[in-house]
């Protein structure tokens, strides 16, 4: 795994160093393509990658996990589909990256006016039992979160992380009503410190506001300012080996309820105290 930022900045370190394109010596036409010169040698330094480049919050969209959804033009092509309500796939369509039981209905959809990270989400309906293969992260102590949009038609699901049951079932209806004391959400503008203490209170309840860098086009506000846009703190884990992890969710509610998955976050535990809220 490597990190690529806007402007072709590869593996940028905290001191600002990165490997990039030497624009003055690039776009050189060759027989079968073009040559682009790098400013430095691209070397994988385990210490630098583990302790600097990859030692940061990692946020990723649920639909970005199975490569089949991007390679087959499902992702990015499911927004506001005319005369349709999204896409569905068979339980084995995505191989090991995303599987679910036959009793489940899977809906993949998106909308330019929906309060979702990157505009889309996966909704698992009926008696679902599904598993997602998450991104690999380096060894260390990490906190894992689920980003979602609270709605009255959501349901409850039991979470399993790497095969181990995690706490009590999470109810995605919680937060559907503004002022729900179970999440503790209070608008930043209604506080004396722009929401700083409210962020701490929400964390104590197991929740966080959505990132401020994401935009809610329907109301033309940052996603952080929408009370239904929440992050649920699943747990903190100590990973001994570098590798991918499995997230399983199983329905414990009425068949008509759904579990919505929008995006996920991993963050090193030692960064939580000083975590920025913008990005």
Q: Locations of the language-model features?
A:
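Short acidic, Pro/Gly- and aromatic-enriched capping/linker segments at domain boundaries
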Residues: 11-29
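Extended non-catalytic domains of envelope/secretory-pathway proteins
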Residues: 1-3, 7-11, 25-26, 36
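Extracytoplasmic
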Residues: 5-15, 41-279
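Well-ordered beta-strand scaffold positions
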Residues: 17-19, 34, 164
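FKBP-type peptidyl-prolyl cis-trans isomerase
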Residues: 27-44, 259
């Amino acid at each position: 795994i490597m990190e690529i930022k806007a402007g072709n900045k590869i593996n940028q370190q905290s001191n600002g160093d990165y490997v990039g394109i030497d624009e003055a010596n690039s776009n050189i036409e060759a027989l079968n393509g073009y040559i682009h010169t790098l400013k430095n040698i691209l070397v994988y330094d385990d210490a630098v990658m583990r302790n600097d480049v990859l030692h940061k919050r990692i946020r990723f969209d649920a639909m970005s996990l199975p490569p089949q959804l991007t390679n087959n033009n499902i992702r990015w092509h499911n927004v506001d589909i005319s005369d349709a309500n999204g896409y569905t796939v068979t339980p084995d369509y995505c191989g090991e990256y995303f599987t679910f039981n036959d009793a489940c209905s899977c809906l993949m959809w998106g909308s330019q006016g929906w309060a979702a990270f990157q505009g889309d989400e996966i909704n698992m309906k009926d008696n679902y039992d599904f598993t997602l293969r998450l991104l690999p992260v380096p060894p260390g102590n990490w906190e894992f979160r689920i980003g979602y949009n609270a709605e009255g038609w959501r349901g409850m699901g039991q979470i399993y992380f790497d095969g181990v049951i995690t706490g009590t079932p999470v109810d995605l209806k919680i937060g559907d009503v503004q002022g729900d004391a179970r999440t503790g959400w209070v608008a930043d503008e209604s506080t004396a410190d722009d929401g700083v203490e409210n962020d701490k209170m929400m964390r104590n309840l197991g929740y966080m506001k959505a990132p401020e860098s994401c935009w809610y086009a329907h109301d033309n506000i940052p996603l952080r300012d929408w009370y239904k846009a929440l992050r649920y703190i699943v747990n903190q884990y100590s990973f001994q080996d570098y590798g991918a992890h499995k997230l399983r969710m199983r329905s414990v509610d009425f068949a008509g309820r759904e579990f919505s998955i929008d995006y996920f976050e991993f963050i090193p535990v030692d960064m939580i105290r000083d975590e920025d809220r913008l990005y």
